[in-house]
Structures are given as C-alpha cells and as structure tokens.
C-alpha cells in the first residue's frame, strides 16, 4: 500500500516525527499499528474499502507502531485492503471463494436477501421504562424492519440509521450500495459460524478439505502482541484474542473473538471444543457477560469436552 509511505507519528505536543519502523501487517492485524481510530469524522462517507484505507494513510499514527494495544477497526480494514491488492479480487469475492463457499456458509453475507432478512434477530435492550433485570425489549420498536429494508434495497433507497442499527449493521449507508469491510457488516447464523469454528479447531481442515495450513492456524492463534498488555485475561494473535489464563471455563491458549453486540466465538484446543454463542444486546454489562458466557462455556465443556 504505497499511500502509507512517509506516514508520521504524532507526538503528545502535536509535533510529527518518522516512526521507528513502518507499520507491519502483523501490527495491523493485532491492533498495535497506531493507526487513526474509526470514530474520526473525516472517515465518513467513503464508497469503497480502497477509499477508506487511503484516508487512514493521510493521518499521522497515534503512537509508535508495536508499542500499544488499541482495538482499531481501521487496522482490520487495512488488512482487508491488502487482501484485495494481493489477490486482485474485491474483499467480499475473496471471502466468498476462499472461505464461505468451501465451508458451506450459505447465510453469511453483507447483503441479506428477502428470505434472510426475514430471519434477522432484533437487537434487545433493558426495559428502561419499567426497569426489571429479567425483562428485555426490542431495541427498535418497529416490528416491520426486515420488510421495509427489503423494499428500500430493491429500490436503491437510503435506509434510516435507526433501521440499520436494529438490523445489526450499525452504519447509516445506502443499504444496496454498502461495501464489504472486515471491521463489521457481515450477517451470519449459528450454523455458519460453527463451521468456521470447526475448521479452526481442526487446524484448517473442514470435512476432509484443507482451507488453511496448520501453520497459518498456529500463527493466528499464537500471541503476537509480545509484552504489550491487552487485558488481564487475554493477549492477541492475528485477528483473535488468546487466553493467557483459564477464564470463563476456557483453557489457556483458547482463541476467538466477540462482537459489539456480545456475540462470541471461542476455539478451545485443550478441550477440543468450539463454542459460538449468538447474542444481540447493546447494553450487556461486563458482569452479565461473565455470568452468561461462563455458565454456557462451562456447561458446554462438561457435556461435550474431552471427558465425553
């Protein structure tokens, strides 16, 4: 990506200086690149992953590459753009050909059709009008979101931000013209995510077909952040968190990820188990996550772990 040539680092006093080394692919994929954050207002209204990444390159780095973990969707998107340049294919086409089709992930897409949209889970939240820890309500009260979205999709009309947020997209773009990006926007199902997890658990093999080399899986699931701290329970690999201590029933070395709406997937090589838990909650507290995830993970390991 030649547009990153000459990128500078911003000092605390606003001064600029050359980085000790240019950012690497490894740093991009383990969130230590120092790239600008996706919340910057100058990054809105782009029409392609190529445009997005070109904008990232115009901003100075927030800190020296490799010195701080800072979860950064701009880095993940830059990785996706590298895929486009190296493969010569749009990101969505590459993912479809190399991953989704071989895994039979028929419901994984950035552009749900009418039948898929009708099955979309709505985002839930607490009932703030009548607080009750046991009661959740739909995040958006409109019960006809999928039908309205499909109508607008077919007409190429803009879809309101609130509707997109309820669907789980979380971005106010014209739906029919959305572009695929690694940082978010894909829809999927438990079956499809489970197939991905199974392939990773089997060191890159799914139904007797190798999709990733065993070395690639070892690399992505190995700690890539070195001594840079991430959080007390985890370090980071290539696009995945890696457990550095037993946590929520998962063993050291388990790897996986969680989404903004609290969906999680983990691969636990020690227990020979892959777990995908699909959740649609914006306001789930850290304590609630510990209780729910821990209970589900421990129950799954007890029932399906190596002892069985």
Segments from the language model and where they lie:
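Short, surface-exposed loop or secondary-structure junction motifs
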Residues: 5-252
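A short acidic/small-residue loop/turn micro-motif
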Residues: 281-284
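Active-site-proximal flexible loops/turns
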Residues: 38, 275, 287
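Short loop/turn motifs at secondary-structure junctions and domain boundaries
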Residues: 256-259
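Surface-exposed amphipathic alpha-helical segments
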Residues: 289-308
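Short, surface-exposed beta-strand/loop micro-motifs that present aromatic residues
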Residues: 261-274
